[in-house]
Amino acid sequence: MLVIHQRLPARSPRWDEELHLTYEARSKSRLRCFAASGEEVGLFLERGQPPLADGDCLEARDGRLVRVVARSERLLHVTCASPLELTRAAYHLGNRHVALQVGDGWLRLLDDYVLKAMLEQLGATVEAIEAPFQPEHGAYGGGHHHSHHGEAEFNYAPRLHQFGVRR
């Protein structure tokens, strides 16, 4: 088994192996899967990190470099007649904490018939496609929770904005 514990800070121009993974698989810090060659792989990455992205490189325990490839998956490709309508669609999806890939004049999300119906009700054009999914990571670092229990554990600094010092 190819055992991987480390993400590399930069992409590498060369690699020894590839992992073709869906977005869900790239979001896990612990995963048993298979490399493109068929070799069994065990991922044991640091918890609390952003999902792996297409092109990211990992280092295996035996020194081999492994490149991550975003596997194509079934997505909804959303367009609207105006920027305002697209903004409304993004608002309603964000209100439901849906992972979104944002492009110039379009949104993409994992295929979901309930969200498709909602988007069509909002006037969006929704097309089912097969493509790699690379959603936004979000504005804040660390984990996601709504509880104030154990607040110190989850006291992550904002990545985009500094609103003030938390004590």
UniProtKB/Swiss-Prot annotation:
What does UniProt list as this organism's lineage?
A: Bacteria, Pseudomonadati, Pseudomonadota, Gammaproteobacteria, Pseudomonadales
Which keywords does this chain's UniProt record carry?
Chaperone, Cytoplasm, Nickel, Nickel insertion
Instruction: List the record's Gene Ontology CC terms alphabetically.
Output: cytoplasm
**CDD domains recorded for this chain?**
UreE
- Family to which the UniProt record says this protein belongs: Belongs to the UreE family.
Q: Name one GO biological process term.
A: protein folding
Entries under Gene3D superfamilies matching the protein? Urease metallochaperone UreE, N-terminal domain, UreE, C-terminal domain
Q: Which Pfam families match?
A: UreE_C, UreE_N
Q: Which organism is it from?
A: Pseudomonas aeruginosa (strain ATCC 15692 / DSM 22644 / CIP 104116 / JCM 14847 / LMG 12228 / 1C / PRS 101 / PAO1)
Q: Where in the cell is it found?
A: Cytoplasm
Question: Per UniProt, what is one GO molecular function of this protein?
Answer: unfolded protein binding
Q: Which domain of life is it from?
A: Bacteria
Instruction: Please give the function described in this protein's UniProt entry.
Output: Involved in urease metallocenter assembly. Binds nickel. Probably functions as a nickel donor during metallocenter assembly.
Gene that encodes it: ureE
From the Swiss-Prot or TrEMBL record, give the protein name.
Urease accessory protein UreE
